[in-house]
């Protein structure tokens, strides 16, 4: 079964047959564990025709180590030939199946490689079989020394680099550096998530033999310091942004609370009814009382008008005292409307009194207390026209009498002068 590697480069091909895998850094390369290819747990591709080995599963961490992890830094080791790959895989797996896990098409990362045999995964921070791992590593290193001697004998087919095997022998003394596990800087990650804590140091018994480890360690420490500083700056920026968001939310909540308080406790509206007495004509009353009604109605109307005006003015003063809210415009409109209604009632009452007085002056409808306004107006018009005609007739008679009197005076004067 072909496994996806955790250290795949960005520039490497994606296909399963040509996937570049750091098999020498995977713990499974030293002590492999496999699963059956079930439908529920088909996490990895497998080669057709390959038999599935048995799955020893006592340790719970053996299941988690097969899960995929975030991509890591590209491999810096030299690319191996197909013959070397076959020999290495047959040594580790004890199987005749050709594994293409060491094929790497990119030559930019073939100058050096990471010198750690432990898998570059944060899951190894909780691995409980450290002693067992050290034992297996020491045994496999011895087998690698023997294999190196066999491979160096055949220079045509085997071109395994001596520094590669030496670095394998010295890799047990090195610990995993956080910059190796998390090779990409935080600014290029798109702020997808915060970097986990670095793995604990696992020191093995094999002493170091290469002098290049000190330089790489110092570079790794510098990279680690830079990453920590960038991480702190990003955390501060995120905290500032969060604080700004909280302030805006609080402001909105305050506004919402003020709106809710205004809606729950609106400003009290002082609404007082103005008692305006509307006096209607008593059509059922006796005709003898028609002359006394206008004066009484006028007195009552004046008293009611004074009372309504006083009440409206008092309501206006009370409203101005109590209403100190944004709804003062509405209250003023209500006061104006109320005053207008009072004045309109007063006008109607005066109009009724005028009709009643006019009806009493017309002889034809003077005794008809149920006469309509239109009838009163028509009869009043006819009465006016008749009065005008009578006036003209009387004026003409007066003029005739004046002339006749003048003639009589002139004749009397002549008679006196004759004597």
UniProtKB/Swiss-Prot annotation:
Residues 248-262 have a biased composition (Basic and acidic residues). This is Transcriptional regulator Myc-A. SMART domains: HLH. It comes from Danio rerio. Residues 305-315 have a biased composition (Low complexity). The lineage of its organism: Eukaryota, Metazoa, Chordata, Craniata, Vertebrata. Residues 217-245 have a biased composition (Acidic residues). InterPro entries: bHLH_dom (IPR011598), HLH_DNA-bd_sf (IPR036638), Myc-LZ (IPR003327), Myc_transcription_factors (IPR050433), Tscrpt_reg_Myc (IPR002418), Tscrpt_reg_Myc_N (IPR012682). Residues 335-387 form the bHLH domain. The keyword Nucleus applies. Residues 199-269, 305-343 are annotated as: Disordered. Efficient DNA binding requires dimerization with another bHLH protein. Binds DNA as a heterodimer with max. It is found in: Nucleus. GO terms for molecular function: DNA binding; DNA-binding transcription factor activity, RNA polymerase II-specific; protein dimerization activity; RNA polymerase II cis-regulatory region sequence-specific DNA binding. Keywords: Activator, DNA-binding, Glycoprotein, Nucleus, Proto-oncogene, Transcription, Transcription regulation. Residues 394-415 are annotated as: Leucine-zipper. It comes from the Eukaryota. SUPFAM superfamilies: HLH, helix-loop-helix DNA-binding domain. Alternative translation initiation from an upstream, in-frame non-ATG (CTG) codon or a downstream ATG start site results in the production of 2 isoforms with distinct N-termini, shown in this entry as isoform 2 and isoform 1, respectively.
